[in-house]
Amino acid sequence: MLTFTERLPPRHTASSPPPETVLFSLLLTAEERTRSRYRLDSPEGFSLCFRLPRGTILQDRDFLRGENGEIIQIIAKPEPVITITAPSTDLLLKAAYHLGNRHVALEINPDYLRLAPDSVLQAMLEGLGLAVNEEIAPFNPEIGAYQHYHDLEEAKKG
């Protein structure tokens, strides 16, 4: 079993691992990337165990280091989502406001919003005049205002 206990710095930093050191890439859904304690089997046949600091939320393209130095890359797995677009920025902002009031996991982009399928929310958004499309796509919801603080606290401990 390969046990992963450490998230490495993002790829754009000098301390990121070179691509040739990555054992394999692992596709995980948005929900799976929120689990800090997790066991699964990879498509390559490896038994994996995540023992990451509590509260860790993995992002697309993150790297993890195993107890024996193995490195894997996490990739956002395409999954069922609804993508919201609007004829105006104001209307898209209103949609983000209403979804935020409902504490919905939400991916925010300048041209669209993306969330997990929900028929009640879909009807509300369509009622507001937004275009709602069901699709299969990587889902990268915002991690929230306090995740950055959590990462800083973990760095201070390490």
Curated annotation (Swiss-Prot):
SMART domains: UreE_N. One of its GO terms (biological process) is protein-containing complex assembly. The keyword Cytoplasm applies. InterPro entries: UreE, UreE_C_dom, UreE_N, UreE_N_sf. It comes from Microcystis aeruginosa (strain NIES-843 / IAM M-2473). Transmembrane segments: none annotated. Its main location: cytoplasm. Belongs to the UreE family. Involved in urease metallocenter assembly. Binds nickel. Probably functions as a nickel donor during metallocenter assembly. One of its GO terms (molecular function) is nickel cation binding. Signal peptide: none annotated. HAMAP family: UreE. It holds the Pfam family UreE_C. Keywords: Chaperone, Cytoplasm, Nickel, Nickel insertion. The gene is ureE. It is found in: Cytoplasm. It comes from the Bacteria. GO terms for cellular component: cytoplasm. This is Urease accessory protein UreE.
